[in-house]
Amino acid sequence: MRIYFAPLEGLTDAIYRRVHHATFGGVDKYFMPFISPSTSLSFTSRQQADIAPRENAGMPAVPQILCKDAGLFLEMTKLLRDAGYAEVNLNLGCPSGTVTAKGKGAGMLKDPDALARFLDEIYSKAVLLVSLKTRCGYESIDEWPRLLDIFLCYPVHEWILHPRTYREFYGGRPHRDFFLEAAAKAPFPVVYNGDLFRVSECREMNRFDLMLGRGLAVNPALAQEAQGGEGLTLDSLLLFHDRLYREYLKWWPEHAVIGRMHGVMYYLIQALDCPAPVKRALKKSADTAAYTDAVRRVFTESAITQDIHFTPPGT
C-alpha cells in the first residue's frame, strides 16, 4: 500500500509539505495544490515558490494542473518537464463552484465527448507521465459507466478516484463499488480517495494505494501509523506545529502567518480534547503574541483524543 497526501488549497504549500515530510513518515507522494494556467503561461510568485525544485528537494512531489484547454495543458507540461518533474496530475475532480462554473475540475465531467477529445490530445502529445484525479460523475451516478469507458481508453499513469459525483460534493457515502469496478478493470493503478479519516479506515482499504487529505490534515501521523509506524502523540504534534510556525515566520509577514496557522489549527485541534475556552482564545488571536500564548495553552491543557478523525463542519 502506498499513501499519497492530497493537495489542499490554502494549506499544503511547499513549506507545509517539507515540514510534514521531515516530521512524519508514511507518505509516498505529495500532490501540490493545482496550477490553473493562463494564456501567458506565467506563474504567480506563490506558485513559483511552490513548484521550484529546490523547495521540494528530498521528497516526492507532483504538480497538479487545473485546465480545460489541451494546448495550455501541454505547454504547461513542457515547463514542468524543464523544471525537472517527470509526472503531472490532471484535476478532474475539484467540486468548487467557482471552478466548475468555468468548465474546469469536476465541471469537465459534464460533457463526456468533450472530455474524450481533451484526453485524446493530451495523451497523444504529453511530454510527462499524466495521472488523473477524478470523481465518478457530475449530476448523477448514472454517468459512471460512460466515464469509466472513457478513462480506460488512455495510458493513464495513475487514476486517483474519489467515488462521489460533483453534486454529492462531500456528502453521503462514497460509492466504493465504483472504485472496486475501476480497480478490477483498469490496466493501470487506481488509487482510492474519499473519507479516509481513521487508521482503521485506511487499513480496511490496504489492498489499494490511497490518497489522504483532510484525515492527514487532522492527524499528520495518519499515514505513518497506517503503514505500521508510531501513532500521533502530543509531543510529535507540538513538534510539527512549532516547526511549521517557525518556517512561516521566516518567510511571511505576521498577518499572513497568523491567518495560515489558524487554517492549520482548524484541522490539528480536532486531534485534541481541548477545553472550549482555550479554543476560543486561539480563534480570537490576531497577532503572534496572542497566537503563541493561545497555542501554549492548547498544548498544555489538552490531550490527544481517543478517536482522532476529521469532523466536517456542521456535524
Stretches found by the model and what they are:
Residues 1-315:
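Flavin-dependent oxidoreductase catalytic cores
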